[in-house]
């Protein structure tokens, strides 16, 4: 698998709503009505999950797996169903529904293994529970040349004219899904209470069925009633649980906090940052009234719809059917589960607890389907009625259509609650696609939003970006500021005033910290508001635009849109150089962007042009990266010092032992023998101390002609070649000694220190240092600790002025002294002892 980051690919095939009452599980609604023909499915792939065997013996529902939050649990009824499926080997059937050209011919592999046969009596009975014996679907073997019409389950998908299949009673086409009768899915996708608020996942061939089942509490309620405490009143539902920074894992004992409002403190602010631009609040009193009257509302509606069916719902499960690629299975299923499945189910749980929403809508949908069955309504007509008359069916339809297109799904569940769901889009990539990778032209090409060792010392190259934006970033709006302000002000909501104020203060040339200092808005609030705008695709976080930075035409820009972009650019900047001319100028030798600005009067206008180019992915910032180079000379000096230390340590230990032996001998009875031994030993030590008679390994060698080839501390380190220190912030013991040796060689007085003083004694070294050249006159030993942490090859050197609060000219003078190579000619007198960096430039 390529390391290139990929944009969201929901792989969404269908959404299924399963409810369970005392009468048993029921497949209430699914969308689209015929996933095999109505979904734009990817072509058949040979690299489908090979771990799932293609013979009938291995055809079974994969073990329902839970994530870390779920632990291990299983459903005995599902196991029984799996054994039933396993008992039929090499069975075949044909799925109903036409598959258009270019779609997977295998129909997810279901037709290669399973043949469904309903009882001759007509419609199969719904089982009272998953483990009940009645209503079980029978499986049988079929020949390879068996007629498609023999399978009434398959034929039902094509019956939109009201005629019965194979002479049997009428079976509506909406009572089968993916070629299988509804009662099969009702049993399979209705788990036991052990799966309450856990990731429920079933794999069938190429498909993954993932849900977040919610069960009623033992006391008959859907939320745990909190104890009354005198606390600050909080908002009950602002869509906060729908945020991108929400914890993906639920606390096991969290019964009602999962959808019941924002957390306190900073976490609450960040959660609130992801509400929709038009949130509708539900007050606490309304929630209590709705929750208290939910039973009455449910009973009244049930009486109206079906006087004989007065049972209540005990479980609902919104199941998403996914078809992810083999190599991206875990990543794709996780992003859909974390961002869509779990949050949608939480919102439904909230409304179910408040107004009995899910059960009322399920009853309403069932009532409409029964009427359609009596009238033998066509499938398309029924679904038009359902989406028009049922808010839950319309919500499922909206989620499917929007998420399948990688768009934001704005779902109004009721007049009081409106939620927005999305899979956060990929806004940038640090990689250019390879020959076998799918290209995404126009995607912002940069490493600016990657986690670096300075931001997180424990992070590595493949760590995901931080959810909380760093204070040194700036905000680049992806739409016209006036248009965004109009939307915000028209939407109302808790965040609208703060968002409008921040948008008026924000500039792409100012970091969040600078905006906070100038506007008085707390930094945490700015980060929260910026995260809100970034998450909802209204803005992008970028390094602040500066005239001293260098920008180039992005290698990933989408030149196929040049003609359209040229017209839009001309409309925005009619009196300035055209888009092709700007791109041509930026394609030349890289130089600071300020060199393209004709005068100070054009500065703001040219910054607006640069923001426009960045917004469309036409240009990217060319940034500098550096690492510390260790020469063989440094390595040899450190190695000689290390070996000398070992010899000295050995000699000190020998002297200590000999002194102790001499002391013990003087106190003994045989003084003469001890005196001889002492004399002999002293003579030996004297010869060792002189280094003339006793040879020792690694003895003082001539530094001018060393014969060492590998380090004593690290036998894999060659002393005859140069090396780079990859991560100075976590250097090894040997690398630390190299760094100490490098610093010890820095001169005490820079060569140019005396040339940049003011006053009469400037030539003699007296007078004050000119602030303009302070970086050239300060000893490098004093500057080194501030800069070394950025020399890891991952942190851009352009970050240093912003993060350290230093002037850019000062920083670049220091970096030039250290060996940074730039395109500009430098008049700084360099000292070879300070030239320790190896630098590169890229995005």
From Swiss-Prot:
Residues 43-52, 223-234 have a biased composition (Basic residues). Residues 62-73, 84-106, 677-693 have a biased composition (Low complexity). GO terms for cellular component: GATOR1 complex. One of its GO terms (biological process) is positive regulation of autophagy. Residues 248-258, 667-676 have a biased composition (Acidic residues). Residues 259-269 have a biased composition (Gly residues). Residues 1-23 form the signal peptide. InterPro entries: HTH_NPRL3, Npr3. Residues 30-174, 222-272, 657-706, 749-768 are annotated as: Disordered. Mediates inactivation of the TORC1 complex in response to amino acid starvation. Required for meiotic nuclear division. PANTHER family: CGTHBA PROTEIN -14 GENE PROTEIN, GATOR COMPLEX PROTEIN NPRL3. Belongs to the NPR3 family. This is Nitrogen permease regulator 3. It comes from Aspergillus fumigatus (strain ATCC MYA-4609 / CBS 101355 / FGSC A1100 / Af293).
């Amino acid at each position: 698998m390529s390391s290139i980051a990929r944009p969201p690919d929901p792989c969404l095939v269908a959404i299924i709503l399963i409810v369970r009452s005392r009468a048993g599980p029921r497949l209430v609604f699914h969308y689209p009505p015929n996933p095999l023909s109505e979904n734009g499915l990817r072509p058949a792939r040979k690299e489908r999950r090979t771990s799932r065997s293609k013979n009938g013996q291995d055809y079974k529902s994969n073990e329902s797996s839970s994530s870390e939050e779920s632990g291990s649990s299983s459903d005995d009824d599902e196991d029984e169903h799996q054994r039933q499926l396993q008992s039929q080997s090499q069975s075949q059937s044909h799925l109903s529904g036409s598959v258009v050209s270019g779609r997977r011919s295998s129909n997810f592999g279901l037709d290669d293994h399973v043949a469904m046969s309903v009882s001759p009596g007509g419609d199969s009975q719904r089982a009272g529970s998953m483990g009940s014996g009645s209503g079980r679907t029978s499986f049988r073997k079929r020949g390879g040349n068996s007629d498609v019409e023999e399978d009434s389950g398959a034929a039902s998908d094509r019956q939109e004219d009201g005629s019965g299949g194979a002479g049997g009673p009428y079976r509506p086409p909406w009572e089968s899904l993916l070629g299988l009768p509804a009662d099969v899915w009702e049993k399979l996708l209705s788990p036991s209470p052990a799966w309450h608020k856990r990731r429920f996942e079933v794999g069938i061939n190429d498909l993954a069925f993932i849900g977040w089942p919610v069960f009623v509490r033992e006391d008959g309620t859907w939320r745990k009633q909190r104890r009354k405490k005198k606390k600050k009143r909080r908002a009950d539902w602002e869509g906060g649980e729908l945020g991108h920074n929400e914890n993906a894992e639920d606390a096991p004992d969290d019964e009602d906090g999962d959808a019941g409002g924002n957390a306190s403190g900073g976490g609450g602010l960040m959660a609130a940052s992801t509400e929709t631009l038009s949130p509708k609040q539900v007050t606490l009193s309304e929630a209590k009234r709705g929750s208290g009257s939910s039973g009455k509302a449910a009973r009244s509606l049930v009486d109206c719809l079906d006087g004989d069916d007065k049972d209540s719902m005990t479980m609902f499960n919104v199941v998403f059917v996914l078809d992810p690629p083999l190599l991206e299975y875990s990543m794709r299923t996780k992003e859909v589960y974390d961002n869509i499945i779990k949050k949608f189910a939480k919102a439904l749980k909230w409304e179910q607890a408040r107004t009995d929403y899910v059960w009322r809508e399920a009853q309403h949908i069932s009532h409409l389907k029964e009427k359609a069955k009596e009238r033998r309504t066509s499938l398309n007509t029924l679904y038009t009625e359902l989406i028009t008359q049922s808010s839950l069916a319309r919500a499922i339809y909206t989620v499917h259509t929007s998420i399948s297109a990688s768009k934001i799904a704005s779902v109004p569940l009721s007049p009081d609650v409106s939620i927005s769901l999305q899979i956060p889009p990929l806004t940038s990539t640090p990689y250019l696609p390879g020959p076998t990778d799918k290209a995404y032209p126009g995607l912002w090409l940069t490493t600016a939003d990657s986690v670096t060792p300075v931001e997180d010392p424990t992070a590595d190259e493949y760590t995901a970006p931080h959810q909380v934006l760093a204070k040194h970033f700036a905000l680049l709006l992806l739409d016209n500021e006036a248009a965004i302000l109009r939307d915000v002000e028209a939407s109302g909501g808790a965040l609208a005033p703060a968002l409008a104020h921040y948008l008026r203060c924000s500039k792409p040339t100012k970091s969040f910290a600078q905006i906070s200092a100038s506007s008085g808005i707390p930094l945490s609030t700015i980060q929260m508001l910026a995260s809100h705008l970034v998450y909802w695709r209204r803005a992008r976080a970028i390094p602040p635009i500066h005239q001293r930075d260098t920008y180039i035409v992005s290698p990933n820009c989408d030149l196929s849109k040049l003609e359209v972009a040229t017209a839009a650019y001309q409309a925005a900047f009619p009196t300035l150089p055209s888009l092709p001319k700007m791109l041509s100028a930026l394609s030349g030798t890289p130089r600071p962007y300020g060199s393209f600005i004709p005068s100070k009067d054009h500065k703001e206008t040219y910054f607006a042009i640069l923001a426009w180019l960045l917004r469309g992915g036409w240009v990217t910032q060319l940034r500098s990266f550096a690492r510390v180079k260790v020469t063989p000379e440094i390595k040899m000096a450190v190695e000689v010092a290390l070996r000398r230390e070992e010899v000295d340590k050995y000699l000190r230990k020998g002297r200590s032992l000999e002194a102790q032996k001499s002391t013990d001998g003087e106190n003994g009875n045989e003084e003469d023998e001890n005196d001889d031994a002492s004399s002999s030993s002293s003579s030996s030590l004297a010869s060792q101390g002189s280094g003339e008679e006793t040879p020792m390994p690694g003895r003082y060698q001539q530094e001018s002609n060393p014969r060492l080839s590998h380090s004593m501390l690290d036998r894999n380190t060659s002393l005859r070649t140069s090396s780079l220190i990859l991560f100075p912030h976590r250097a090894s013991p040997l690398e630390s000694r190299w760094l100490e040796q490098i610093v010890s060689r820095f001169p005490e007085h820079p060569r140019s220190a005396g040339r940049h003083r003011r006053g009469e004694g400037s030539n003699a070294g007296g007078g004050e240092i000119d602030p303009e050249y302070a970086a050239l006159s300060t000893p490098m030993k004093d500057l080194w600790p501030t800069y070394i942490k950025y020399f890891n090859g991952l942190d851009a050197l352009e970050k240093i002025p912003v993060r350290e609060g230093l002037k850019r000219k000062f920083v670049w003078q220091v970096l030039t002294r250290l060996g940074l190579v730039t395109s500009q000619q430098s008049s700084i007198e360099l000292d070879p002892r300070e030239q320790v960096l190896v630098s590169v430039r890229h995005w």
